[in-house]
């Protein structure tokens, strides 16, 4: 026991619309708007129910409706979406601009459905029918392509929906991470922050201290002075933090005097390293002595060099008790 149509209940006209009725409906809506569809037929002078007027306007008389034959792209879209969505014509119509769901449904039932049946494809499942041998009809290739296209389109639509959701979630997570993160400030001090302010004493910047073995001036070295001084020569590994400016200059002058005192020893050691003949003679003397063919003069020369090297090593690497602590 369903509801009886409103046209039967009220005794209104049914069936196809005439051009005169279409003109009355268009004229009234253009002048007054449709308003309430229930009261529109009486105001427009039509012997139709409100539902019939609404469907006539929505599916046929709207000015933005695309009329005419469906093109090939629209037919493929309808078949692919029908394989995915079934008879949900309103959802299919959203993918076809300016086409109504009623028009799409009519075109499916009158053209596309019959075409699939002739190709041996079930219009409901979009799969080849088992009872009809497709090879005998010569349509197996087209059916396979159509089935594959429908499956691919279904997978594509599902993938697009999934990617849209994931992209929205990633964008939200990135925004939350960006807003929650705060910049980290490092409070470490560089060696320049520990050095004294040399610019406060301009008369000291003009003092040039030259080393007998280096051409670097003291003003060029002041930017690269480390924050602490470690005496490697001491076996105890004593590390002294940077002293004030006056104490540091005194220690530097003391080291400069020590360097001048050892100038003669450094010259001898440099001559030993750079003198190719002396090195060759020392090594040749070592080899000849091992082989039992060395002369007395070479042995004496080798012993002198050995004693000389021992004295240099003792000077460079003194014992902890003799290490100067400035």
From Swiss-Prot:
SMART domains: SANT. Residues 208-217 have a biased composition (Polar residues). Keywords: Developmental protein, DNA-binding, Nucleus, Repeat, Transcription, Transcription regulation. Residues 280-290 have a biased composition (Basic and acidic residues). It is found in: Nucleus. Residues 37-61, 89-112 bind DNA. Residues 9-61, 62-116 form the HTH myb-type domain. Pfam families: Myb_DNA-binding. SUPFAM superfamilies: Homeodomain-like. One of its GO terms (biological process) is cell morphogenesis. Residues 197-217, 280-299 are annotated as: Disordered. GO terms for cellular component: nucleus. One of its GO terms (molecular function) is DNA binding. Expressed in trichomes, epidermis and mesophyll cells of young leaves, stems, petals, sepals, carpels and stamens. It comes from the Eukaryota. PANTHER family: MYB FAMILY TRANSCRIPTION FACTOR, TRANSCRIPTION FACTOR MYB16. Involved in the control of epidermal cell morphogenesis in petals. Promotes unidirectional cell expansion once outgrowth has been initiated. Coordinately with WIN1/SHN1, participates in the regulation of cuticle biosynthesis and wax accumulation in reproductive organs and trichomes. Functions in cuticle nanoridge formation in petals and stamens, and in morphogenesis of petal conical cells and trichomes. Functions as a major regulator of cuticle formation in vegetative organs by regulating the cuticle biosynthesis genes CYP86A8/LCR and CER1. This is Transcription factor MYB16. The gene is MYB16.
């Amino acid at each position: 026991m369903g509801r009886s149509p409103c046209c039967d209940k009220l005794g209104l006209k049914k069936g196809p619309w005439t051009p005169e009725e279409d003109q009355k409906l268009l004229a009234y809506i253009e002048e007054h708007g449709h308003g309430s569809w229930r009261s529109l037929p009486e105001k427009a002078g039509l012997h139709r129910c409100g539902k019939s007027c609404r469907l006539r306007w929505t599916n046929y008389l709207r000015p933005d409706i695309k009329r005419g034959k469906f093109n090939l792209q629209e037919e493929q879209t309808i078949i692919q979406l029908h394989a995915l969505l079934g008879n949900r014509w309103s959802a299919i119509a959203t993918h076809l601009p300016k086409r109504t769901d009623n028009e799409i449904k009519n075109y499916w039932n009158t053209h596309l459905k019959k075409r699939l049946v002739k190709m041996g494809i079930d219009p409901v499942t979009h799969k080849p029918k088992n009872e009809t041998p497709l090879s005998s009809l010569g349509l197996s290739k087209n059916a396979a392509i159509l089935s594959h296209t429908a499956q691919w389109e279904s997978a594509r639509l599902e993938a697009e929906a999934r990617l849209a959701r994931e992209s929205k979630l990633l964008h939200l997570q990135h925004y939350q991470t960006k807003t929650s993160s705060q910049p980290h400030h490092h409070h470490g001090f560089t060696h320049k922050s520990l050095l004294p302010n040399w610019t406060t004493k301009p008369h000291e910047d003009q003092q040039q201290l030259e080393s007998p073995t280096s051409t670097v001036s003291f003003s060029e070295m002041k930017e690269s002075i480390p924050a602490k001084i470690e005496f490697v020569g001491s076996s105890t590994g004593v590390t002294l933090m940077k002293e004030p400016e006056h104490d540091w200059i005194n220690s530097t002058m003391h080291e400069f005097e020590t360097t001048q005192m050892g100038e003669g020893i450094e010259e001898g050691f440099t001559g030993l390293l750079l003198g190719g003949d002396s090195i060759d003679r020392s090594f040749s003397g070592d080899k000849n002595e091992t082989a039992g063919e060395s002369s007395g003069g070479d042995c004496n020369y080798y012993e002198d060099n050995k004693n000389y090297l021992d004295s240099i090593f003792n000077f460079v690497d003194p014992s902890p008790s003799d290490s100067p602590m400035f």
